[in-house]
Amino acid sequence: MSYEKELAAAKKAVTLAARLSQEVQKTLLQSQVWKKSDRSPVTAADYGSQAVVSLVLERELQPDKLSLVAEEETGDLRKNGSEAFLEDIAKLVKDTLASEESYTSSPLSTDDVLNAIDCGKSEGGCKGSHWVLDPIDGTRGFVRGEQYAVGLALLVEGKVVLGVMACPNLPLASAVCATDNSSQEDVGCLFFATTGSGTYVQSLKGNSLPQKVQVSSNENLDEAKFLESYHKPIPIHGTIAKKLGIKALPVRIDSQAKYAALSRGDAEIYLRFTLNGYRECIWDHAPGSIITTEAGGVVCDATGKSLDFSKGKYLAHKTGIIVTTKKLKPWILKAVRESIEEENLYF
């Protein structure tokens, strides 16, 4: 089945949501406000991004009922005392949509914005079609003016069939070679993939044609690179790297942008192991998983099984997430299993 119409709508939705987030990030950096609280700029970006994506999908696809699995809900926005904050969010959404020529004359009330955000209350599941959204992934990177992502995926009968990810601060060339002197014209990526059609990247500004990407062809673990967030990883990551003989320093990127970077060969390994009891949300991995697998990569748990997105808002797995290339997968699985056994860890 072709998903051309859905892909076009998703690309437009994510591009506009990224535009909103970039405006908020500018304000954030100027004001030096960084804490994510109920009425912080970070939260405004989350709400605004979710509203924009919901409204664009509704307008472009006109479904009988939009099913969106997403992070935000409007309970706090509907409380007394939140009126001014809600007005600020509504203005962000209106201004963003007005920047798209086809939406300039569309009226929008605060109730419209609230209802759009609350479209994200879907539970997902194994039946029907569900959009899955992370409106702002990578809060730490976002507040520092560094890497974050807006990720959107489409689930059909429990399978991810489409993914779009905007990485507004990711260089078009390579995350590894980026410098402080990188031209702003070369920054901002839009990755997208549909099942069976490969993964592509183009400028988020829309001024370049899509280019097909592939994961790294490197088979030498001595030359392989890890992708890690800036916050301190749990110790097993270091144990696994040592077993594999990894010599290169990790490529540090916050958010799902790590999936995107791996899909185009910036690095070969991304591991995500969390503390016991933590449940992974599907919006943190659905967009990135198809972007990586359609580029020739592998996304699985520590037993080698593919991730299951059909169980609702949370992934049904307990053993971490491994993102790598098909060539390196056997070695990484072996190192992961040995490390888990040696450290007597339970996930």
UniProtKB/Swiss-Prot annotation:
The residues annotated as the active site are D46 (proton acceptor), T139 (proton acceptor)
The cross-references to Gene3D superfamilies, in alphabetical order and at most eight, read: 3.40.190.80, Fructose-1,6-Bisphosphatase, subunit A, domain 1 (3.30.540.10)
Instruction: Report residues binding adenosine 3',5'-bisphosphate.
Output: T139, S255, K258, R272, D284
Residues annotated as binding Mg(2+) 3: E71
Keyword field contains tRNA processing: no
InterPro entries for this protein: DPNP, Inositol_monoP_metal-BS, Inositol_monoP_superfamily, Inositol_monophosphatase-like
EC number(s) on record? 3.1.3.7, 3.1.3.57
**Protein name per UniProt:** 3',5'-bisphosphate nucleotidase 2
Q: What organism, scientifically named, is this protein from?
A: Arabidopsis thaliana (Mouse-ear cress)
